[in-house]
Amino acid sequence: TLPTDRGNLCCAWHTNGLIDPLAIALNHNRFFVLGGRHDLVTRPLLSWWTRRMAVQPVVRKAELLRGGCSEEEATQINGRSLLMLATGISEGFGCVLFPEGTSHSESSMLRFRTGPMRTVLAAGAIAKSRGNELPAVIPIGLHFRNRELFRTDEWVEYGPPLQLVDDDIPDEL
């Protein structure tokens, strides 16, 4: 069962584009703060939606290599987004981040990324300083009957929550 007395960060392997976060958000019992690729926030058609949903942009290395922004700008954008997501989680919201995976046609494991863990630890520090419950990490499995087909059956599997404990959060940051 998903904890309802604290914020949580859902972490899944990303295989199916924009469908994955939607499937998780619709099957979750909390309101969400959203993080997403920086180029989703800047694309003409998608940006209209992502701005209205207050999606926090995350600049990836691939976007830096394409020249989407400078390294200094990326550091500022990512730092601000991490703080916004962590603050939302610390106040009891849900969040979903996809640290691994590629498109459904090339679904293979990639090098592990640390962003989700850094986000939930920052959320834990904020929650601890405000006297709120420490957040949990929720591992998620996304399963599709036939992932190549549009409108295929999907199953969202929530793993047991990985609860942060007081010892995980230093007293001074």
Q: For each predicted feature, which ranges?
A:
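Soluble catalytic domains of membrane acyltransferases
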Residues: 1-171
